[in-house]
């Protein structure tokens, strides 16, 4: 997974509130000693009370509302949280599990804060799951109530009458009723006691290789992560995040929501990727939280816009050359003023997670003046455990462990590659109702991630791939698919790739399923004049074969891709755009 934040930001207006990141301590001889002093919190209650009392007049959330834009201050959020808590208590839900499901919006965030800070256990659900899956998860989690957004009604039709259904469209009514109860003396929020170390958040993993499991996190798990990330990467009260990724994933929830709420910053909600460009201009974010596939497509769009301009490629090359001569992000953003304006004019940081970002996109964004920070984590680690920070960034690794988090490489081979294990306050309580699965991954307090990694000479870490996706050849040699995909996806003729071991005549063959970049292929084929469909297909195969041959040259012979599949349809993915490797492998082998 991947993180980003940086303090090189020039505000449009100087904020009235004092920045509470009061001091930076850095030992220049040891990147791992880079820390900020920040307030300690151990629960979402601490987070909610602290931020709402410290930054009452700051904008907490901003979003489209009809034809206009609505802003909600921290003071207003606090009033809504207390009122909604009173309402939920009146339904007998204290200490119960309450699910939240739907698109990113204020009501989703309000439900999360209210349940965690003043009611019970929150269960974020993926709105894109089937009705059967949602029914199963609600039953499995023993959810007592579900707050759902518009568009999710049909998936809840078969949910039993024992589960209270609360459409988010009725939120104004719930809050009004809660305020009435409070006016009569109800103090359910204030009287509720939060145990920071008990189950507080139940998250069902989407998984890329297997069945979903319920990850049990305590509020202290999440809050330790918020604090430890803030110690490495500064977020200020005048910052604004543009939230695009689904909030039910702990990555977006922690990095794109709670971390900004902790700092008194604001969160803007994007309702649709079709509106992404317009939302950049409308909301003017300083930070963009995204995944590689989204960032790479956005970067490709920017470069292609230049290419279509008269002399655009030359202009881009000259601007990049100028950019290399200056180190300050602000100066680089002025050189690329057109790009900067199209992204709202205030963007200076990009948070990228879930997989590795291509070197081309990484260096491209850096040349534009945006600070790109990379990190790693899983739902089970709340989620971040290793990351870049304000003292260190690189395109070649995932950075250093967070303060308070220990990592080790288990059973490394001759190249130093082994399974990454993590120990710290961010490690989950276990898998819900699944002690066997818990025992398989948590041993002696260490969480075994299932990811292969190595420690580099400078002390930073690099992820090599997943153990479950690793290809083991007949001679015992091992191939990491992600390593090959990394270089394939870097080529302009490749939109996306999936590498796996295909069983053929009793042997395992390294196989690459590749989705060509249609625009780049079409542009290349224009050079050959008019072509029949068959000729176009053959030329496309030749181009992709050449790309694979070039990538094969970067590796030892045993790692070379031996079989190529030209893919015409999209890969099966999770809602964070990660390829579901097991499903894809089974599909390709049918």
Question: What is each PLM-predicted segment?
Answer:
Residues 288, 331-461, 467-470, 495:
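Conserved AMP-binding/adenylate-forming
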Residues 56-59, 182-204, 211, 234-240:
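Conserved pre-ATP/AMP-binding loop-to-beta segment of ANL
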Residues 223-240, 247-337, 346:
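Conserved AMP-binding/adenylation subdomain of ANL enzymes
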Residues 129, 424, 429-430, 452-555:
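AMP-binding/adenylate-forming catalytic core of the ANL superfamily
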Residues 57-105, 109-113, 130-135, 219-220:
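Conserved AMP-binding/adenylate-forming core of the ANL superfamily
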Residues 71-75, 200-226:
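Conserved AMP-binding A3 loop
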Residues 7, 151-196, 302-338, 568:
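ANL superfamily adenylate-forming
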Residues 471, 498-500, 546-590:
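Conserved C-terminal "lid"/linker of ANL adenylate-forming enzymes
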């Amino acid at each position: 997974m991947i993180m980003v934040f940086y303090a090189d930001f020039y505000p449009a207006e100087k904020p009235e509130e004092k920045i509470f990141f009061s001091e930076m301590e850095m030992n220049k001889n040891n990147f791992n000693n880079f820390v900020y002093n920040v307030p300690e919190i151990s629960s979402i209650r601490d987070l909610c009370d602290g931020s709402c009392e410290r930054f009452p007049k700051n904008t907490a959330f901003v979003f489209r509302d009809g034809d206009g834009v609505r802003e909600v201050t921290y003071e207003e959020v606090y009033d809504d949280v207390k009122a909604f808590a009173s309402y939920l208590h009146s339904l007998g839900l204290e200490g119960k599990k309450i699910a939240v499901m739907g698109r990113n919006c204020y009501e989703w965030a309000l439900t999360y804060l209210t349940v965690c800070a003043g009611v019970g256990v929150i269960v974020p659900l993926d709105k894109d799951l089937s009705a059967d899956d949602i029914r199963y998860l609600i039953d499995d989690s023993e959810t007592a109530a579900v707050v759902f957004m518009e568009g999710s009604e049909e998936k809840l039709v078969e949910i039993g009458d024992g589960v209270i259904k609360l459409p988010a469209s009725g939120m104004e009514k719930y809050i009004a009723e809660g305020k009435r109860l409070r006016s009569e003396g109800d103090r359910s929020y204030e009287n509720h006691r939060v145990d920071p170390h008990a189950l507080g958040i139940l998250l069902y993993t989407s998984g890329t290789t297997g069945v979903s499991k319920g990850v049990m996190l305590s509020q202290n798990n999440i809050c330790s992560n918020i604090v430890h990330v803030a110690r490495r990467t500064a977020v200020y009260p005048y910052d604004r995040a543009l939230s695009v990724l689904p909030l039910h994933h702990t990555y977006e929830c922690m990095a794109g929501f709670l971390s900004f709420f902790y700092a008194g910053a604001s969160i803007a909600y994007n309702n649709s990727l079709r509106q992404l460009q317009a939302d950049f201009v409308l909301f003017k974010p300083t930070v963009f939280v995204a995944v590689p596939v989204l960032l790479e497509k956005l970067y490709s769009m920017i470069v292609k816009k230049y290419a279509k301009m008269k002399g655009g490629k030359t202009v881009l090359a000259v601007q990049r050359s100028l950019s290399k001569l200056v180190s300050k992000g602000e100066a680089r953003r002025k050189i690329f003023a057109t790009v900067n304006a199209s992204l709202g004019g205030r963007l200076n940081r990009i948070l990228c997670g879930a997989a590795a970002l291509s070197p081309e996109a990484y260096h491209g964004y850096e040349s534009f003046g945006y600070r790109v920070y990379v990190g790693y984590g899983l739902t089970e680690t709340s989620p971040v455990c290793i990351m870049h920070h304000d003292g260190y960034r690189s395109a070649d690794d995932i950075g250093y462990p967070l303060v308070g988090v220990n990592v080790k490489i288990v059973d490394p081979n001759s190249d130093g590659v082994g399974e990454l294990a993590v120990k710290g306050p961010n490690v989950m309580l276990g898998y819900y109702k699944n002690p066997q699965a818990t025992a398989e991954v948590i041993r002696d307090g260490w969480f075994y991630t299932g990811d292969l990694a190595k420690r580099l000479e400078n002390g930073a870490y690099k992820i090599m791939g997943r153990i479950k996706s690793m290809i083991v050849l007949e001679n015992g040699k091992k191939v990491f698919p992600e390593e090959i995909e990394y270089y394939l996806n870097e080529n302009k003729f490749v939109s996306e790739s999936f590498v796996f071991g295909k069983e053929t005549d009793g042997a395992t063959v390294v196989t690459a399923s590749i989705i060509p970049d249609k625009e780049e292929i079409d542009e290349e084929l224009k050079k050959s004049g008019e072509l029949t469909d068959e000729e176009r297909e053959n030329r496309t195969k030749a181009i992709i074969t050449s790309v694979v041959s070039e990538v094969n040259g970067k590796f030892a012979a045993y790692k070379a891709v031996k079989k190529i599949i030209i893919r015409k349809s999209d890969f099966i993915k999770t809602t964070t755009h990660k390829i579901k490797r097991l499903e894809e492998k089974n599909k390709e082998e049918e």
